[in-house]
From Swiss-Prot:
One biological process term in Gene Ontology: regulation of protein localization
Keyword Transport recorded: yes
Domain of life of the native organism: Eukaryota
GO cellular component: BLOC-1 complex; endosome
Alphabetical UniProt keywords: Endosome, Transport
Family membership noted in the UniProt record: Belongs to the BLOC1S1 family.
SUBUNIT field: Component of the biogenesis of lysosome-related organelles complex-1 (BLOC-1).
Main location: other
Signal peptide (from-to): none
The name this protein goes by in its record: Biogenesis of lysosome-related organelles complex 1 subunit BLS1
Span list, region Disordered: 97-117
Organism this protein belongs to: Eremothecium gossypii (strain ATCC 10895 / CBS 109.51 / FGSC 9923 / NRRL Y-1056) (Yeast)
Subcellular localization: Endosome
Length: 117
């Protein structure tokens, strides 16, 4: 019972104690840290990030973006060349198959029209 009275007296006390003074100081420090130092830290971090990361990346993009556009043209050109090569390969295969069929058939007068012997 005596302990309860002491606790109630401490809790309901209007006078400042060392603990309440320490708590007030902690709360004031927290407010200062949050309102001033954290905002300052975020601003410094943003400036540092901008300076070390964003700006160099932007410069790299500006430097090499025109080359990347040229590579798109190169890709299109390579696709056309590949298509033409496939067309030539198919044509050669068909010509070889045609020659093989011509040699298997008995030579006749009609066959000589297309041959240049």
């Amino acid at each position: 019972m005596e302990l309860d009275q002491d606790v109630n007296r401490i809790i309901k006390s209007k006078t400042a104690t060392k603990v309440s003074a320490m708590q007030a100081e902690i709360e004031a420090n927290h407010a200062y840290i949050y309102d001033v130092q954290l905002k300052k830290l975020l601003r410094l971090h943003d400036e540092e990030l901008q300076e070390r990361c964003h700006t160099p990346l932007r410069k790299l993009y500006a430097k090499y973006s025109s080359r990347a556009e040229g590579n798109r043209d190169l890709q299109t050109w390579a696709e056309h060349v590949e298509r033409d090569l496939r067309l030539l390969e198919t044509t050669l295969r068909l010509v070889r198959e045609g020659k093989a069929q011509d040699t298997e058939q008995a030579p006749g007068k009609g066959d000589r029209i297309f041959r240049s012997d």
